[in-house]
Amino acid sequence: MCGIWALFGSDDCLSVQCLSAMKIAHRGPDAFRFENVNGYTNCCFGFHRLAVVDPLFGMQPIRVRKYPYLWLCYNGEIYNHKALQQRFEFEYQTNVDGEIILHLYDKGGIEKTICMLDGVFAFILLDTANKKVFLGRDTYGVRPLFKAMTEDGFLAVCSEAKGLVSLKHSTTPFLKVEPFLPGHYEVLDLKPNGKVASVEMVKYHHCTDEPLHAIYDSVEKLFPGFDLETVKNNLRILFDNAIKKRLMTDRRIGCLLSGGLDSSLVAASLLKQLKEAQVQYPLQTFAIGMEDSPDLLAARKVANYIGSEHHEVLFNSEEGIQALDEVIFSLETYDITTVRASVGMYLISKYIRKNTDSVVIFSGEGSDELTQGYIYFHKAPSPEKAEEESERLLKELYLFDVLRADRTTAAHGLELRVPFLDHRFSSYYLSLPPDMRIPKNGIEKHLLRETFEDCNLLPKEILWRPKEAFSDGITSVKNSWFKILQDYVEHQVDDEMMSAASQKFPFNTPKTKEGYFYRQIFERHYPGRADWLTHYWMPKWINATDPSARTLTHYKSAAKA
């Protein structure tokens, strides 16, 4: 996890513009660099480094002697870089995984390059010989990327929007900043004056497609057919491989552990893989909650069962409320469920950075979207509609859960790894017949639970524990986090303010006092940027008025059982 930043065709002083890049310094606390592009006085790269691989030669922009005309600034991890290096007999100058991008590009061009990458990434690639700039982002947008571009060809790119909003340009007082779409790459022409012109934006991969790099994978051979035992066996193979490939790091590995199915499966599988790799330190797991939190109790059971070095972080409602301003600034969103869920993740990331030496942190993000884990999937009209909803959620991950996971950890200089969003695992899961993936017997993620039932990875009560949203599970059932927040904002936002909400916030007008309160904080940090959030996250098919799972009928009936 790093912070990348670049300008092309700036008409303001670069030394002044570069101050904006310091707003993402948290993403790379180990080192930083600014570098002007040879022959272009108005183009430069900025880079903040979190040293995870090759601490000696890993600074960016990456340039190698063989390709003096190529400049690469990227944030991410390319898990198959060694396999590709060996396959094509590339001669590396560094041990940095991102160097593979330069070699692949020289060999086959940008489309073949990006389709061959197994990993998570956001990159800026400059080819001064052919006068081209390329931007690219991974399938699910696990690594963030934002851009601003003017009609006259000024281009600014950054890992987070906050690194772009204060940039100056002569043609506009207000730069339009927008997220770069996941699963896409863009080709731009570089003009002699340093400005650019967009040539094409290409969607190179859809989440349901098996990735091109699969033909070079070293995964065990998968078995054909969709009978249950075959599918379960294939899922176990792919999940183990998703964990194993993500062990690539020179820093200590830890794992977030809520005690729910997803994080527990990741933690148990991760610990098994670390033992097999003969890693010489215990796995640290981390749980957070208030007193009487069901998550804390469940996480403790898992940690005791798998034998991790477990850390519990307690916080109270006052600490959670006080963190809201920092959280919304870090997130760059005002989405209600995202803000709620981010507080606990932000506070535990702060604890990890301050009190441990774990830097690479595994987590269970992406499973709910992929495996139909949200409780409202019980109300899906048909397996096909559930499949459509699952794919929609995956496409929008970069606006919600993936955004939350990246920003809350990156704010404290941590790198998050999410094996459920592995290309091979997710594309295989999405290829299964729709009726295999729906909730069964009143239990969501039934197939995933069945897959690991006989593996002794987890206690049965954890493997079959009902879904509990992270923002709910950190507090007791009697005093949910969403209720604590709603009670607090009741005294911060009055009825008169709500009646004028549509005039003050005509776009995405908040419907609740909680939403109004978050929007106020967001506008204070990012005035006029409300369109970064296209819509609020809400459950489907159930006419919900609040995104909390604890407001749903299915949850209430399950809680009484």
UniProtKB/Swiss-Prot annotation:
Modified residues (N6-acetyllysine): 385
Catalytic activity: L-aspartate + L-glutamine + ATP + H2O = L-asparagine + L-glutamate + AMP + diphosphate + H(+)
Record keywords, A-Z: Acetylation, Amino-acid biosynthesis, Asparagine biosynthesis, ATP-binding, Glutamine amidotransferase, Ligase, Nucleotide-binding, Phosphoprotein
Pathway: Amino-acid biosynthesis; L-asparagine biosynthesis; L-asparagine from L-aspartate (L-Gln route): step 1/1
GO biological process: asparagine biosynthetic process; cellular response to glucose starvation; L-asparagine biosynthetic process; negative regulation of apoptotic process; positive regulation of mitotic cell cycle
Single GO molecular function: ATP binding
EC primary class: ligase
Signal peptide span: none
Residues annotated as site: Important for beta-aspartyl-AMP intermediate formation: 365
GO cellular component: cytosol
Protein name from the UniProt record: Asparagine synthetase [glutamine-hydrolyzing]
Gene source species: Mus musculus
Gene: Asns
